[in-house]
Amino acid sequence: MVSNGHFASAGDDSFATSYEHGVQVVDEDKEFNRNLSKYLAYENVTPAGFNYHLISVFGSQSTGKSTLLNHLFGTHFSVMAETERRQTTKGIWMSKNKRQEPQRENSLPHVQNPNMADNILVMDVEGTDGRERGEDQDFERKSALFALATSEVLIVNIWEHQVGLYQGANMGLLKTVFEVNLQLFLKDKRSSPRSLLFFVIRDFLGTTPLQNLQNTLMQDLQRIWTSLSKPSGLEDSRIEDYFDFEFAALPHKNFQPDKFVAEVKKLTLRFREGHREPSKHNKTEGGIFLPEYHRRIPADGFAVYAEGIWDQIVNNKDLDLPTQQELLAQFRCDEISREVLVAFDEAIVPFETKQAEAAQSGNPEVLGGLGPAMKNARAKTVKGFETEASRYHKRVYQMKKAELEEKVDTRLKALFAGQLAAAHKSGISQFSDAVTAAVKAGQKKGASYDFADIVSKERKLALETFEKDAKATVVDGTSWSNYTQELALYQKDLEKISAQLRKDEMRRLATRVERWVRSRLGESVGLEFNALGSGRGGSGAPETGDKPSEDTIWDRIWSIFVDTVLDAERRFTERASSFDASLEEVDVGLWRLRRKAWGVLRSKIDEEMMEGNLLLKLRENFEDKFRYDAAGVPRIWRPTDDIEGLYTKARESTLTLIPLLSRFRLRETDTPPQLDRWVGYTPSSATPADEEDLAPIGGVDDDGMSLEEEMTMLSESKRQDLTVRFKKAADGVYVEAKRSAIGGMTQIPVYFYILLLALGWNEIVAVLRNPLYFFMLFLCAVGAFVTYQLNLWGPMIKMAEAASHQALEEGKKRLRDFLEPSEAGPHAARYKNSTEEYEMSNVKAPQRTNSGDDDDEDEGSW
C-alpha cells in the first residue's frame, strides 16, 4: 500500500519507487516497518556512518507540522485539506531532507542549499490531542519516548496564540518528554544524553516580542520540570542538564506567504553542524546539530536499533538505551564480521584446501605466496571491521573485534603451523637427500670427501631455507606468528638426521673396511693354509726365506690378523675424523670392527678347515714329504728304496698337523690368544642396534660358550674321521709308489733290444736296399708321423678294435649258422657255451693280476 503521497507504509514490501518520498516507520497500529533499512539504503544513508542527523516534530493535531517540514526540508508529507479538520499523519513517518538532493525524475524542483547538514532525516510524528484517539495517550507517550531515544532535535510546532496555555502549548506532551527523559537517564547514569527542544512559533505577528514568548515558554517548562517526581539522586537536577532550547518564529503562511518563505529559508540555515565555544561560556556557534546530541548509532545500524527501541517501548518494557546500543552493536558487529569474513574466505580457503590435500596425500607442500596472502587478508578483514564496527558501542566493538581476530588468527595459525610443518618435513627430506647425493657423488669420483663439511653446508642451507619460508609466512602484530620453537625443533631434527646420516656413513665405512679386512685376511690366511700343502724344501720352498714352520701356523695367522685389524682401525679412525664423529661413536665403530674382523677370520678359517679342503691340504703335505727328498727333488721309486720307512715318517709327520690345527693356540704360551682382552669391553654408548647384527663370540659374550670352545676348530669326532680318511688317502699313495717300484722290474731289458737288432740285421738291410720296401717303409713312417701329429692314433686303434670285434662276431654267427643243420651242431653248441664262459673269465682276469705276462697268457689261451 502506498499512502501519504508515494510513501511506503509499514508492512508494505514495495519496489524502490515506493520510497521516493519517504517511509512509514510505525503505523497507527504500532507495527514497525521492517523495510526501514531498505529506505535508508535507497536514500544512500546507510554508508554515511555517523554523518547523519535525525529530527522529530511534535505538536497538536492539525497545527501544520507536516506543512512546516515540507517547506523546511522539501519533503512531501501529506497535509490536511483546508476545507477539513481531521487527522492526516497516522503513526510515525520518515523522509530525507530533499533540499540537498539532486532532482529526480518526476520530482518537484527544490531549492539547493549547500549550507544544510548532510543526510538529515525527518520524522513526522502523529499529532497529539486528536479526536481520533481521544483520551488514549498511550501512542502519544510511546511515540514521544521513541523520538527522544532516537532523535537529536525535537521540533515543537505551536502557534503564537497558544503560548501560555497548558494543552494548547503542548505542555502535557512536554511533560511526557521530560518524564521519559528521566527514565532514560536513570538507565544510563554514566552519561547525560542531551537533546535540543526547538520551538517553532507559527503565525507570529510580532506584536509580542519573541524574547517574551521565549521567557513564557521557559517559565512553563521550569514549572513542569519542578513538578516532576525525580528519581533518587536527581532531586536537584535542572532542566538545562538534559535539554538545550532554541526558538524560532515564522509569519502566517497564508496572510504573509512571501515573508513566510523568506523566514523558512533563513531557518534552514540553522540545520547544520555546530559546536560549543569554551572560550565564550559554551556559547553555540554554527548550526543546531551539536556532537553531544547525536545518539552515536551508525547509519547502517539505525534501522535495527530503532526496531529494538520500538519493540521495548511497545511491549511496555523499561527502555534501556545502553543495553539497546549494546545489542545493536552485537548484532551489527556480527553482521560486519560475517561480511568481512566472506572476503577473508575467498583469499584463504584456496590455501587451506591446497594444504589439506597435500597433507592427506602425505606430501606436505610449502605454499608459495601464503605469507603475503595471510597478511593482506588479515589486514583487510580487521581494517574492514574497524571501519564499519568502530562506530558502535566501544566495549562491544572491542569484544567483537577480539572475537573476529581470534577466528581469523585461529585459521591463519593453522595455516602458519601447516606451512612450518611442510617446510620442516620437506627441509628434512631435502637435507637427507642432498647429503646422500653429495656422498654418492664423492664416491663416484673416487676422491676422498669431507662428510662433516657436506653435512655442515647442507644443514646451513636447510636452516636458511626454513627461516626464509617461515619469515615469509609471518604475520606482523600477532602473538602466534613466532617460529622460534619450530626453528629449535627443526634444528634438533636436523641434528638427529645428521647423527643418523653420520652413523649410516660410519656403518658404510665399517662395511668398506670390513671388506678390506676380509680381502686381506682371505689372501694372507689362505696363503698360510696353502703352505701346509707345500711341505718340501729346495725348489718347493718359498722364493725368499726358509719354509715357515708348521708348528707356528696359528702364531703367524694371529700376527697377520692383529696387524691387519690395526691397519684397518687406523684407516677407520682417519676416515671417521672427517665425519665429525664423537669419541664415543669412534669407540663403538672400532669395537664393532674388531668383532666383525674376528668373524671374518673365523669364517675364513672354517672355510679352510672344511673337510674336503683340509683333507686335500693334508694329502698334499704328505705327498710333498713322501714323494720329494729334502732338496725338493722328486723321488723315482726303485725296488731297493725304503718305501715303507719314508711312508711311515711322512704319514706320522702329517698326522701331527691334525691336532695342531684342531685348536687355535699360540706356540709360546700353548694357550689361545686373549680374545676377550683384544676385543675389549662393550662401549657404554653402544645401542642395541649396534649389537643386533654382531655374531656372539665365545669367551667375550655371555652366550654360554667359553674361549676354549671358541678356539676349537675341529671337534674330536671330526678329527678322528679326518685321520681315518687321511690314512686311506696316504695308503693309496703308498700303493701307487709300490706299483711304480714293481713296474720298473718288468720292463724289457736293454740287451733284448741289442739281440733283436743283431738277429734282424739282415732283414733291416734287405729293406733298406730294396727301393720298393724302402719306399713302402717311408710311406708307413710318414703316415705314422702324420697320424701322431694329428693325435689320431687313439681313434684309429678304437676303430680297429671295433672293426675286428664286429668281424669276429660276424664270423661266429656264420659259423653257428653253418654248424646247426649238421651232426656237429650239439658239439658247436657246447663249444659256444664254453666260449662264453671263457669270455667272462677273460673279462675278470685283469682284476686278478696286474702283470703284463698274465695278460699275454690270457690272450694265448684265447
From Swiss-Prot:
Domain of life: Eukaryota
UniProt: GTP binding residues: G59, S60, Q61, S62, T63, G64, K65, S66
Segments traversing the membrane: 748-768, 772-792
Localization in the cell: Endoplasmic reticulum membrane
Alphabetical list of Pfam families matching this protein: RHD3_GTPase, Sey1_3HB
Biological process (GO), any one: endoplasmic reticulum membrane fusion
PANTHER family: PROTEIN SEY1
Protein name in UniProt: Protein SEY1
Species assigned in the record: Uncinocarpus reesii (strain UAMH 1704)
